[in-house]
Amino acid sequence: MLTLFKKGKPKGGSVDDRNSSYRESDPMLVWGTAPPAYLDVYHDERDKNELQFNTKSYLIQANLEVISSKPIERTTEMLKVLDVMVDEYDGSYLSKALIITSYLTIGTHLRRMMSSVKNNHKYNNGFTEVIEFTGTAEIHPRDQEIKYNKYLMTSHMGEPVSISYQFSGKKSKRRGKNILDAYNLELGNGSKPPDLKDLLESYEINLCYNLKGEHGFTNLVKS
C-alpha cells in the first residue's frame, strides 16, 4: 500500500512513463508532494445559511485496485470506470461522504503497477492516515468504526474490468490532514485534479461553503 502523503517518486510506472502524448492533456494521476491552493469556491445559496459544520478525525485505511484487459490511459477514462459505484454502492448512507470521497481520492491518484501477464493492466493505490473530514453532523458515523468492502465488475473498451475497494474508518483523537488536501494533491504534470464537487453529485453528496467560510460535506436530500 502506498502512503497518501509519501514524498519523492513512488514505485511503479505511471501512464506518463509509457505514453508521453498525454502529459499535457489529461494524464493518469500520480501522487504530488503538496496540495494546491483552493481556487474554486462552491456556494449553495439556498442552504448555506443553515449549515453547521464540524470537523472530526478518523484513522482511515483504504485501498483500491483496478484490473483491466485494456490499458486505461486517461483520468477521465478511469473515472468513467469507477463510476459503476454510483449504482452499486450499498454501504452506509449517512457516512457515504467518508467512504466515497476516499474512493475518489484514491481513484484519481492510481498508479500503474508492473505486470508480467499479457493484457493485464493493474492500477493500485491506498493510504493509512489520520484524516479530517468537515461537514454536517449527519456525515459523521455514530459507531466507533465503520467498514466497507466492495468488489465490482464493469467494462472498458468492451473488455472486462474488476474493481476491488476496501475501506475502514476509526474515530481518532489525533489531528490529521484534511481529505480535501489529499484529493487536491497536484497531478503528475502539475495540474489540478477534476472538480470533486461534480464527481460527488452523482452520489447525492454536496460539497459547499457555509456562511463562516467552512468547506464541508452534506448529504443531499432525496427527492
From Swiss-Prot:
A GO cellular component entry from the record: virion membrane
Spans annotated as Disordered: 1-23
InterPro entries in UniProt: Vesiculo_matrix
Basic residues composition bias: residue spans: 1-10
Topology of the protein relative to the lipid bilayer: Peripheral membrane protein
Principal place of residence: virion
Note: Most abundant protein in the virion.
Domain of life from the UniProt record: Viruses
Protein name: Matrix protein
Binding partners and assembly: Homomultimer. Interacts with nucleoprotein and with the cytoplasmic domain of glycoprotein.
Protein's job: Plays a major role in assembly and budding of virion. Completely covers the ribonucleoprotein coil and keep it in condensed bullet-shaped form. Inhibits viral transcription and stimulates replication.
An annotated Gene Ontology molecular function: structural constituent of virion
Compositionally biased intervals (Basic and acidic residues): 14-23
Compartment list: Virion membrane; Host endomembrane system
Species: Bovine ephemeral fever virus (strain BB7721)
Keywords of this entry: Apoptosis, Host membrane, Membrane, Viral envelope protein, Viral matrix protein, Virion
